[in-house]
Amino acid sequence: MSDVHDTEPRLLKEPRGGVPDVTSTIEGYHHVCEALADASGSLAADAERASGFRYGHEDWLIQCKREGAGIALLDPIALTQSGADWNEFNEAVGDATWILHDSLMDLPGFADLGLQPKALFDTEIAARLLGLHRFGLAAVTEHYLGITLAKEHSAADWSYRPLPRDWRNYAALDVEVLIELENLMRRDLRAAGKDEWAEEEFTHALANPIRFRGCAFPASPS
C-alpha cells in the first residue's frame, strides 16, 4: 500500500466546496436529486443520529457527495414530514455504488426511509481486510491521504435545529474524501487478491441491513 503517509497529518478543516446548508424543503430536495442525477461515479454517504438524546435510531441528517454534484446535507425528518419521495433519490443515483464507512450503522436507517443502495463499498470492511491496525474513518483517511478529521461532534444531538455551522462542517467532512478512499482501497484490494472477498462482504452487508438493528458494536479504533 504505497500511499501510507508517515509525515505529520494535516487537519482537513473544511470541504473544498465550502460548508453546505441543510436541505429541508421539497424544492431543495428536488434540486439535490437533479444534481445527483446529472453527476457521475460512486455516491459517498453517511448519516447522523441522536441516539444518546432521543429514543430510537432515526437518521436526523444524511450527508452525500457525488462527483459533479458536491456535498448535500439532507434533513430526512423534515423532508419526510413534507412528503418527500425517497424513490426520487434512489432513481437519481441509479446503480451507483454507495460508499459508506461502517455500513452496519447506516444501512438500517437508510432502509427505514426507503433508500436502497444497489451496490456498496464499505471503507471500514476494506480496512479490516487490508490488515490496517486502526480502521476508524479518521485513521483510514490519515493512512491513505495524510489527512486527519476532527471528531468533536460525533456524539452530538443531531436532532438539534438549526444545526450550527461547525456541526454542518463536521458532517460534510465525513463524506468529503470517501470517493478518494474508495479508489485507493479498491486498488489495494486488487493487489492483495482480496477484491472478490471484499465484494462478498459488501453484498452480505447490503442484503442484511435490518438484522443489525439495535445491536451494540464496539467503536472503531480511530
Write out the residue ranges for each language-model feature.
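N-terminal accessory regions of nucleic-acid-interacting proteins
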Residues: 1-43, 47
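Active-site-proximal helix-loop-helix substrate-binding element of RNase H-like nuclease domains
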Residues: 5-22, 63-92, 96-179, 183-186, ...
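Short, flexible, glycine/charge-rich loop motifs used to bind or transfer phosphoryl groups or to couple energy/partner
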Residues: 32-34, 52, 87-89
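Sterically constrained small-residue positions within well-ordered secondary structures
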Residues: 36, 53-55, 114
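A common structural microfeature
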Residues: 40-44, 59-61, 70-71
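An N-terminal structural lobe/cap that precedes and organizes the functional/catalytic core
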Residues: 48-67
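Short, glycine/acidic-rich hinge or "gate" loops at secondary-structure transitions
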Residues: 191-198
